[in-house]
Amino acid sequence: MTNDTVHADAVVTEEDLRLLRDLKVKDRLHDLEVAYCRGIDRRDPELLKSIFFDDAFVRLGDMKEGGVDEWVDWIINEFKPRFENTTHYLLNEWYKVDVKTAEGETHRLSYHRFGDPARELIAASRTFNRYEERDGVWRIAFREVIRDWIHERPVDQELFTGGFAMELSKPGPEDKSYEVLSMFGRGPLPSE
């Protein structure tokens, strides 16, 4: 008999177990990436820090590079305050897993509203990430971001009234999601 596990009529092979483990890891990496989007848009420094290891390095082209604490402080206190609102969307995700390390390329579309009169900046970027599992926890160990394209235009204020009127999202703890979704509080991701 091999190392395969038999369940009734089914045989689970070592390859099946590896694929299942890789799927679980990829799901965890996806959670890190969507938590990044929420942390950026809700301006939640603890959530942002929790997706990275303490010794991780982040590089945003010529904008900023450095350790996680320095980067989070800059993004929350210097970069984001110039925008009334931001929304980040996670698009394509591609991960390669090798036991306790992984690499991933993720594509993002981001929206930034700012200024008087109001303008909107829409940009596409890609992130190149190295992930690691340490003590059973997956986090980002390295991230580099590059820009694919960027576009700026005036905001059509009429679209925020009449038949299109809805409550606008807010960048911090006043966002409606904290009122409606009790499981989505501020702060770090829970450990696995």
Which residues fall in each region the model found?
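Transmembrane beta-barrel outer-membrane domains
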Residues: 27, 83-86, 120-122
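Short, surface-exposed loop/helix-turn segments at secondary-structure junctions
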Residues: 117-121, 157-159
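Short, surface-exposed coil-to-beta transition loops
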Residues: 88-90, 122-127
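Short beta-strand edge/turn micro-motifs at domain boundaries
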Residues: 2-6, 103, 126-159, 163-164
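Acidic/histidine-enriched, glycine/proline-rich intrinsically disordered or flexible terminal extensions
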Residues: 153-192
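Short, low-complexity N-terminal intrinsically disordered segments enriched in polar/charged residues
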Residues: 1-38, 42, 46, 50
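A solvent-exposed, acidic/Ser-Thr-rich amphipathic alpha-helical stretch
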Residues: 45-114
